[in-house]
């Protein structure tokens, strides 16, 4: 079927699937905006080239496919320079949907289906095609849906401002899309016809959006919409769609690690049960639903069996990552170890140094290593086995890139595994910090600033009083912090201020005033912050001097009371002695 042909003939498959649906709409839209010359549209001598141009534009501004047509576009642009210049012009133009139009459409989401459909038609006429249309076609709605997705963050802000339900707007948009999908099949008497590649992509885009919103119930409904019409999309070697399999594993097989409940030993109190926290609890990029559980274990094993046999599935980083998380959530760590050994030839038993390892799937990435680390910790409540396997990966795959998410998860898990009663200085977390510095130094890279990593290290510094760790963190992240502050990142700025104040407070309490001055000069970052830190330092020094003064006065007062009490005892002794 389509994905099999895509692997064998990428250019041909992409063009064939989208020529009929998007060529006319996209090129017509470009003509309306004066981007493409009329000759490009009128001459039928270049149908393939014309499609490539429209497909490239759509891919650039709104559709991020799992496959790409960059090679095809490069070839065609070399043949026709007009197309190349038109592409560049459109890319620069962008054509975003204005705020007023978005507000009008979002407000209409509370109306009935017919009124909402009219509003969507108005939006299409306003942004894409000025010709009035009573009813949008499926192709038009697909184009608009993807364009709205690129502006989803702006739409979320508008929904917040006008007190509209953001998720309901998207679900109503999908309902309209699904209605048109089925209506198309009724018109041509193809009720049982499967969804094509574009329709599957649009539906998966909506699933991704609802997962980010924490609306797993709505995401499940869209997944069922796909599976009902394409029942072989999960387990057929020819028809398997990677995005749909990934979403199936996330929604029905437990492969959403941010939802996993992890025991937090660092917050455990004597006589109380350990607190359970979620890995994504502090993450603001996604919202978590209140409940999450895996349901379909049998299909997971069938998907794993298919994935380990099909090369195109083994080469998918997202699929392997979610498959690992699914086994981890299911508690099948032995199966997980065998899968890791089968794909990357890495096992808990160390290989001899002379053995040459050849991977069968995609090269291990940071996302895959995070899934391995989290999956083993979820079952063991300990980092030992996960770190042992990761050490083998880094040793035998030296080109693996460890991004900010990897270090964030490592610090989160090491923090959760830390037991203050047994390790008062949190040496396990500090060891992870030194490991991170060594890795970046070996690659001659600067660590990227990550809010959650900074927050975890701040909590450790505050709980243990290890202010040299805080200074080391600021020193290592200083270039990245300066860049981030220039971009007005409020959250990062707030956590940096917490670092600074905590360190200044600790240094002042220890009477190291010269060290305080050096710290402010080195990590003030700008004039305003330096001024604020100097004021804070002066206040802390005043409070310290006042506290010391009160302490001395209280000591003198206690000494005076003691001496007076001693004199009274002397007088009493003299009186009693004279009586005797």
UniProtKB/Swiss-Prot annotation:
A Pfam family matched in the record: ATP13
Subunit comment: Binds to the 5'UTR of the OLI1 mRNA.
Name the UniProt record assigns to this protein: ATPase expression protein 2, mitochondrial
Superkingdom of this protein's organism: Eukaryota
Subcellular location: Mitochondrion
Chain segment of the transit peptide: 1-40
Gene Ontology biological process terms, A to Z: regulation of translation
